[in-house]
Regions:
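C-terminal binding/interaction regions
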Residues: 147-186
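Conserved mixed alpha/beta catalytic, RNA-binding, or beta-rich assembly cores of soluble enzyme
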Residues: 1-9, 17-28, 32-150, 163
Length: 186
């Protein structure tokens, strides 16, 4: 039987549910802090899973994309993220083709496949949204993401260095190499 405090916290969480996942998770984070819990930074717990630039393969693709384009794509993804609409965009020819919605990155990749643009050099850009609670809500990629990217015709991925998680990094980078995909951590 829930007490009045529990009901209060459930209502607080429900009120933030429709404001975006960052608002919801930040509210839950605040509740834990108020209750005296120490919330650990996921980046300290999963150091080997944090995106870095050691696997960047730009040199292999420098005839397809410039460093200036990479920076531009990163910045437009950050602008999009400031709207709390999603962590990911798909870009090509200096334009956003598709934006992530509440259905997530996998759905975004699926929607790209429907465009049938496999001949272009489209990239998935997955970043940490401005003002996102980085203690536990980091953008994440992994083997499934890489397989989906490859199957959809997307040619690679740009992630945010030090603010993105890579699930099963060894397998993820094996697949990036196997599928000849572009990878760059900004």
């Amino acid at each position: 039987k829930p007490n009045i405090i529990t009901i209060y916290y459930i209502l607080l969480i429900l009120l933030h549910y429709f404001r975006g996942d960052n608002a919801l998770l930040s509210r839950i984070y605040d509740i834990f802090l108020r209750k005296g819990f120490k919330v650990l930074d996921v980046r300290k717990l999963l150091k080997k899973n944090i995106a870095n630039d050691k696997n960047n393969n730009y040199k292999k693709f420098k005839n397809k994309i410039t460093l200036e384009q990479i920076t531009y794509y990163f910045n437009i993804a950050k602008e999009n993220g400031s709207l709390d609409k999603g962590q990911s965009v798909i870009v090509d020819n200096n334009h956003i083709l598709l934006r992530e919605d509440r259905k997530g990155t996998d759905n975004l990749i699926f929607r790209y496949k429907l465009l049938n643009r496999s001949d272009s050099f489209s990239l998935l850009v997955k970043i940490c949204k401005p003002n996102q609670n980085i203690y536990f809500d980091l953008p994440t990629i992994g083997p499934k993401t890489i397989k989906n990217i490859f199957l959809s015709g997307i040619k690679g991925i740009i992630v945010e260095k030090n603010n993105s998680l890579i699930a099963n990094p060894e397998e993820t980078f094996k697949l990036i190499k196997k599928y000849n995909l572009f990878y760059y951590a900004v």
